[in-house]
Design a protein with these regions (language model features):
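Conserved donor-binding/catalytic core segment of Leloir-type glycosyltransferases
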Residues: 6-8, 165-184
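Short, surface-exposed amphipathic charged segments that create phosphate/polyanion-binding patches used
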Residues: 71-76, 161-172
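Active-site and donor-binding regions of nucleotide-sugar-utilizing enzymes
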Residues: 4-158, 179
Length: 185
């Protein structure tokens, strides 16, 4: 029998997306919850996270199936990760579990086939137009305001916490925008 557990994962082979800073925040602000970060043992981020006190679990090793099944909340930055995507669309995730999709960035393209075909109880978004685009009537999305939470992204909050402590510049590289990418070439 598992204690109240939240399972976090950016990607099976890397950290540094939205799940990592949310884990850092939640382990301080939700101390009664057991926090587990999922990442492969062979990943270069493993040692860095271990030194920072993360409770780590290799998704290819023993104990992962039990941790997934026992987690109250599963918090993911990438719902398409090959090691977990099938679990979201099958009996691999219980109806009593909550699946939170942190996303990687603002949804700008029509992703309804991917979103609608995946078990998502909460989708985190960053902007009002994004939230409206995901929840409005007469769109292809089946999401509602109940599932889509406009909270911003944890890694952006982490950047804000660095103000005045480290570098004071941020370089924006909109590589997701083909028009801007072509203009920069």
């Amino acid at each position: 029998d598992w204690p109240r557990t939240w399972l976090y994962m950016d990607r099976h082979d890397s950290a540094g997306d939205n799940a990592e800073p949310l884990y850092r925040y939640a382990r301080t602000h939700a101390p009664s919850v057991r926090h587990i970060f999922v990442i492969e043992r062979t990943c270069p981020d493993w040692d860095r996270l271990a030194q920072d006190g993360f409770v780590l679990l290799d998704p290819t090793g023993p104990g992962f199936d039990a941790a997934w099944a026992g987690a109250e909340t599963i918090i993911l930055s990438d719902i398409g990760d090959p090691l977990i995507k099938d679990r979201l669309n099958s009996a691999g995730t219980g109806t009593d579990q909550r699946v939170v999709f942190l996303q990687h960035g603002v949804t700008m393209r029509d992703m309804w086939r991917w979103f609608n075909g995946t078990r998502l109880d909460v989708v985190v978004c960053a902007t009002a137009p994004e939230q409206a685009g995901l929840t409005a009537d007469h769109t292809s999305y089946t999401l509602t305001d109940r599932e889509v939470w406009r909270t911003g992204f944890p890694r952006h909050d982490h950047l804000h916490s660095l103000l005045g402590r480290e570098r004071d510049s941020i370089l924006l590289a909109p590589t997701w925008d083909p028009e801007v990418s072509r203009a920069l070439e």
